[in-house]
Design a protein with these regions (language model features):
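Surface loop/turn motifs at the tips and blade-to-blade linkers of beta-strand repeat domains
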Residues: 1-3, 53-59, 104-109, 161-167, ...
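Short, conserved, GDST-rich strand-edge loop motifs in beta-rich repeat architectures
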Residues: 21-36, 80-81, 126-146, 229-240
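Blade-loop segments of beta-propeller domains
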Residues: 8, 26, 32-80
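Asp-box/WD-like beta-propeller blade repeats and closely related beta-sheet repeat scaffolds
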Residues: 57-65, 69-70, 74-138
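Loop/turn-rich, solvent-exposed surfaces of beta-rich toroidal or solenoidal domains
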Residues: 212-240
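Beta-strand-rich domains and repeat architectures in extracellular enzymes and scaffolds
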Residues: 1-37
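Residue-level detector of Asp-centered blade-edge/turn motifs that repeat once per structural unit
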Residues: 13-16, 69-74, 118-121, 176-178, ...
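Beta-rich catalytic cores
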Residues: 6, 35, 62, 85, ...
């Protein structure tokens, strides 16, 4: 889509015929120009130019992954935000006019957050793509494909770890019945499948599916099929 720089993730609200795209020019940030990112809305039927739905937020906004809890006339959008003082999950309500910011979740466990999937208006799972701090240790984690990352769960009141031992936890999503959580392990080149406990939110490993490529974002269609983006050249991905 023209006009969108640095797209990190996309979700589609089928009932509204609308796509939401999280974008942030991270290369500009690396060059010292910390420009604000945005959530863009795109009408899949009209095909008009995408529209910035977050032009006047009152806080730094550098989005990464995002997740949708759809309802017929709207729903909830949760977005990973890399604020200068730490990662947060921003919660937006979908309205006829666009998006309304309705809350922020922060906490010490939200470090190196990559993606998020909501399971209720106030509950979510988030993937943490690294366990090591930035610098040499993180470089070793990437190039040695060390399984130091994981998943945290927010129950509406507090965060807690629910999965670990994953090599670069990236995209995360939910099965249509809510019974399984899928996590893409980019440097592990596999998909982790967990059984989900619906009341407490705990995850139990079910299986790992080796895919032989650097898996990234996961989309689940209405029939339960998984559509997974991938980076076949892992060294190029890690260098990026």
């Amino acid at each position: 889509l023209d006009g969108i720089v640095g797209a990190e993730g996309m979700v589609i609200h089928a009932a509204l015929g609308r796509a939401f795209v999280a974008a942030w020019d991270r290369r500009a940030g690396a060059a010292g120009r910390l420009e604000a990112g945005a959530i863009w809305g795109y009408d899949l039927e009209a095909g008009a130019a995408p529209r910035n739905l977050t032009p006047e937020l009152s806080f730094p906004f550098h989005p990464h992954g995002l997740g949708l809890l759809a309802q017929d006339a709207g729903g909830i959008l949760m977005v990973v935000n890399h604020r200068p003082r730490g990662d947060t999950i921003e919660v937006f309500t979908i309205t006829e006019a666009g998006l309304k910011h309705s809350g922020t979740v922060s906490g010490d466990l939200l470090k190196s957050v990559n993606d998020v999937v909501p399971v209720a208006p106030d509950r979510f799972y988030a993937s943490l793509d690294h366990g090591a701090p930035k610098g040499f240790q993180r470089m070793l984690e990437d190039y040695l494909r060390l399984p130091l990352s994981g998943v945290v769960y927010y129950d509406g009141a507090q965060l807690r770890p629910v999965a670990d031992g994953i090599a670069y936890a990236n995209g995360i999503n939910l099965s249509p019945d809510g019974g399984k959580v899928y996590v893409a392990a980019t440097t592990g080149r596999r998909l982790h499948v967990f059984d989900r406990e619906p009341f407490e939110g705990g995850l139990t490993p079910r299986k790992e599916i080796f895919l032989g490529t650097g898996v990234d974002n996961i989309d689940v269609d209405g029939a339960g099929n998984l559509w997974i983006a991938a980076h076949p050249k892992l060294l190029s991905f890690v260098a990026h």
